A protein has these predicted regions:
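Metallo-beta-lactamase
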Residues: 81-129, 133-136
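Active-site neighborhood of phospho(di)ester-bond hydrolases with catalytic His/Asp-centered motifs
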Residues: 26-29, 50-58, 78-81, 140-143, ...
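Conserved beta-strand hairpin/beta-sheet module of binuclear metal-dependent hydrolase folds
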Residues: 1-42, 46, 126-144, 161
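Active-site metal-binding motif and surrounding structural segment of the metallo-beta-lactamase
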Residues: 32-79
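Active-site environment of divalent metal-dependent phosphoester hydrolases
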Residues: 11, 59-63, 84-86, 124-125, ...
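Metal-dependent catalytic neighborhoods of phosphoester/phosphodiester hydrolases
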Residues: 64-73, 88-91, 223-230
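Structured catalytic core of nucleotide-sugar glycosyltransferases
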Residues: 4-14, 56-66, 117
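Cap/insert and terminal regions of metallo-dependent hydrolase folds
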Residues: 150-250
Length: 265
């Protein structure tokens, strides 16, 4: 199974998961050209193998490429009812809304992936994070949340691959050029997790099976990859049991990051 961050950051987000049975995207916030090129490079059947697009929420950096992708490839889109209703024609253009499917409380199955979700704290209509199981493996994903609830922590716990937001360094945000209002929004309850928020949570949601931690949705203005990486690594070194080896990765806005999980057979 392949897990690929095609792009992650404040300018656009898109993740790709694929097995021999099929594939899907989480968010569609970059250009169709980048998505098509990134998917084709992985050799898993290209866009024809994609069974669905899961949306976390309706902000532009998560849906900017959705309209062109739907008009060319006619892929089903899944999200909460309020998220789908909030997709504006001025952003995505005219699309066939018969391709939209509202999530319910049942586990969604795409190819041989099983997908559940938990709601997050962000200034959007009804934002969610996704938890994916494939065979005996689990991938936990959460970005765009100002806080982590107990529900979020439980949903992410015991993941083989754990993708979590490390959006900003608190000092860089405080001392940076953003307006007071924007600083309060980003650092507030309905904003984004900081490096320190992420570092504090990780030891509680990791388990012995966690092999990869992916730091995601970094701000270009208010963070540095090495700052996020070092903050998290210091926390893990202080709190994880000796002998628990985990690879920490920083997802990039421009360069894909690919991880693999082995099959049972």
């Amino acid at each position: 199974m392949e897990f690929v961050s095609l792009a992650s950051g404040s300018k656009g987000n898109c993740y790709y998961l694929a097995s021999n049975e099929g594939a899907f995207l989480v968010d569609c916030g970059i250009s169709m050209k980048r998505i098509e090129q990134g998917v084709a490079a992985l050799g898993k059947g290209g866009m024809d193998a994609i069974r669905g697009i899961l949306l976390t929420h309706e902000h532009r950096d998560h849906i900017a490429g959705l309209g062109p992708v739907l008009r060319r490839h006619h892929i089903p889109v899944y999200g909460t009812r309020d998220t789908l209703d909030a997709l504006e024609e001025k952003v995505i253009g005219k699309v066939d809304r018969h391709l939209f499917y509202a999530l319910d409380d049942e586990v969604l199955t795409l190819a041989d992936f099983h997908i559940s979700y938990s709601r997050v704290s962000h200034d959007a209509a009804d934002p969610v994070s996704y938890q994916i199981t494939w065979q005996d493996k689990k991938i936990g994903m959460l970005t765009d949340s100002g806080v982590l609830s107990d529900e979020n922590m439980n949903a992410l716990y015991d993941s083989d691959i754990l993708l979590i937001e490390a959006n900003h360094d608190v000092d860089m945000l405080r001392d940076g050029p953003y307006t007071y209002y924007l600083k309060q929004r980003i650092g507030g309850r309905f904003g984004h997790l900081s490096n320190s928020n992420c570092a504090q949570a990780l030891p509680e949601i990791m388990s012995a099976r966690t092999k990869h931690v992916v730091l995601a949705h970094l701000s270009e203005q208010n963070n540095l990859p090495m700052c996020a990486y070092q903050t998290v690594c210091d926390a893990l070194a202080a709190h994880l049991p000796k002998g628990h080896a985990v690879d920490v990765h920083v997802a990039s806005q421009k360069t894909p990051l690919a991880l693999s999980l082995p099959s049972l057979t």
